[in-house]
Amino acid sequence: MKVNKFITIYKDIAQQIEGGRWKAEEILPSEHELTAQYGTSRETVRKALHMLAQNGYIQKIRGKGSVVLNREKMQFPVSGLVSFKELAQTLGKETKTTVHKFGLEPPSELIQKQLRANLDDDIWEVIRSRKIDGEHVILDKDYFFRKHVPHLTKEICENSIYEYIEGELGLSISYAQKEIVAEPCTDEDRELLDLRGYDHMVVVRNYVFLEDTSLFQYTESRHRLDKFRFVDFARRGK
């Protein structure tokens, strides 16, 4: 059976990337150069590049070209409920947390909906960026009920809020409902993160509950899409 030309080109470039011919952050030849190299049409090359992007080999960035992605991504457990400090200890990489906003706020309409909060509830708002190996690649936006977390400081936010909640307040964090989506970057993402031209983020929304089933935290965790993969373990029921 005849194989489409674009699939042949896709496989050839994918093998080159896997073999180290093209390394992470390098830019592939232009569509014009690839058209000449493979003796084919520009549309065929575009189909091959689209397939490479779909399978995580490259990211097409406007004004820059097709950038090879780092396929050795950091793994985030989907089913687990861990703090960034706990995760950082398993990554074996240099990390730093920067607190950009911290304080008590009346809940916005969105947070009222996400936390099932009333307008007169006091809500802690904490916005932090996470720096890994020299790049700010995660933006965490956390919202906690003050009635559950009566005291919070910037120093606690720089270290570990979960460590404080469980160790100092004696609360038992039990489970979370998670939603994972891809969304366009916001102005806030562009301001606080090192996006390197990427225009989409992987967004994880967490609704976190205490042992007594009280919803006490809503988190929006925004990840640069080339840096992470989210993994889970599944077992078939019988």
Swiss-Prot record:
Q: What PANTHER family does this protein's entry cite?
A: HTH-TYPE TRANSCRIPTIONAL REGULATOR TRER (PTHR44846:SF12), MANNOSYL-D-GLYCERATE TRANSPORT/METABOLISM SYSTEM REPRESSOR MNGR-RELATED (PTHR44846)
Specify the superkingdom.
Bacteria
Reported function: Repressor for the trePA operon. It is able to bind trehalose-6-phosphate.
What does the UniProt keyword field contain? Answer: DNA-binding, Repressor, Transcription, Transcription regulation
Listed GO molecular functions? DNA binding; DNA-binding transcription factor activity
What does the record give as the DNA-binding region? Answer: 31-50
Assembly state and interactors?
Dimer of dimers.
Name of this chain's protein: HTH-type transcriptional regulator TreR
